[in-house]
């Protein structure tokens, strides 16, 4: 049994979504950090915040309003010209005021264009999709700088309609599964975040997480099933469990809730991303193939793809 990026059963499902809020924010910052580290190649900025701003400007051009997801921490290189003397304390002030700044800019743009919705930006949707997939980060960066666009071919209206129907069905199915199997009460403290994201910002990095994290997603419906019992004690070959330190979907700090009852042998992938076997990480692939052939796990650590 190979458990790739195992979730915590104790968080199913409202808790999983709540944990993904910080997970996706950190994952987004890791993505921008990767691009900034390779500025000589991508020319999008030498700090994560500079890349974030270039990205935000493109989202705003597509949607009419800027994105509101949490910006990365500022560095000394982000200080405005003439304020370099402020050093790290100045950068820390920029970091502390960053969330309020992006919300204020969003509201200013929203007032000018009331019908503008940030989720209408194809780039924003693409970003949310690719944050957990480091193998696509290079292609994403080239798309962002315009050197190699990733835009899919335009579908005909009928194909687009069917795609939208399929997406709606998938969301309804997810809702049924989540609410039928949920074992974690909603957190009412997340209701303000949900209401703001649902009725004002339409921030895809917050909307779904707060929808279920707050409990609003199930609308008071009681679960039909409970937590499934897990016990790996009778398995002759114990599972191999692969967990990444920067996983936005199943955050690393919760992995023992699965590994302990399953008696898994955990391999920690030191890097970002969700699902690492057969995802272009040769070291992880070799570990997984060796395990599937022999049942042996000879290491506890592996490098991330990024």
Language-model regions: role of each:
Residues 2-51:
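A catalytic-pocket lid/entrance helix-loop region that shapes and gates access to the active site
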Residues 234-235, 240-243:
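Short beta-strand/loop motif that positions the catalytic acidic residue
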Residues 272-285:
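Catalytic histidine-centered segment of alpha/beta-hydrolase-like enzymes
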Residues 248-253:
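Conserved alpha/beta-hydrolase "acid-adjacent" motif
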Residues 7, 133, 245, 272:
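Residue-level signal for short, function-critical loop segments
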Residues 55-233:
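Alpha/beta-hydrolase fold active-site neighborhood
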């Amino acid at each position: 049994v190979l458990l790739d990026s195992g979730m915590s059963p104790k968080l199913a499902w409202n808790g999983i979504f709540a944990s993904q809020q910080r997970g996706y924010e950190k994952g987004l910052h890791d993505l921008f950090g990767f691009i900034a580290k390779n500025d000589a190649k991508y020319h999008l900025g030498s700090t994560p915040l500079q890349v974030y701003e270039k990205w935000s400007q493109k989202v705003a051009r597509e949607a009419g309003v800027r994105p509101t997801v949490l910006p990365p921490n500022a560095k000394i290189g982000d200080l405005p010209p003439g304020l370099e003397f402020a050093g790290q304390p100045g950068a820390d002030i920029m970091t502390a005021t960053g969330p309020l700044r992006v919300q204020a800019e969003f509201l200013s743009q929203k007032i000018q264009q009331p019908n503008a919705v940030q989720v209408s930006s194809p780039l924003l949707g693409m970003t949310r999709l690719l944050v957990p997939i480091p193998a696509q980060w290079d292609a994403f960066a080239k798309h962002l700088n315009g050197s190699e666009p990733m835009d899919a071919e335009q579908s005909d209206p009928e194909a687009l309609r069917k795609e939208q129907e399929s997406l709606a069905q998938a969301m309804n199915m997810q809702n049924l599964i989540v609410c039928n199997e949920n074992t974690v009460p909603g957190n009412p403290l997340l209701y303000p975040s949900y209401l703001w994201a649902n009725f004002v910002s339409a921030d895809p990095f917050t909307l779904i997480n707060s929808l279920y994290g707050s409990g609003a997603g199930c609308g008071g419906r009681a679960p039909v099933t409970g937590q499934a019992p897990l016990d790996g004690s009778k398995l002759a070959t114990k599972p191999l469990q692969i967990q990444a330190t920067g996983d936005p979907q199943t955050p690393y700090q919760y992995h023992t809730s699965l590994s302990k009852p399953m008696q898994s042998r955990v391999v920690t992938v030191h890097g970002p991303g969700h699902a690492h076997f057969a995802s272009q990480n040769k070291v992880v692939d070799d570990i997984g193939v060796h395990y599937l052939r022999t049942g042996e796990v000879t290491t506890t650590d592996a490098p991330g793809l990024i």
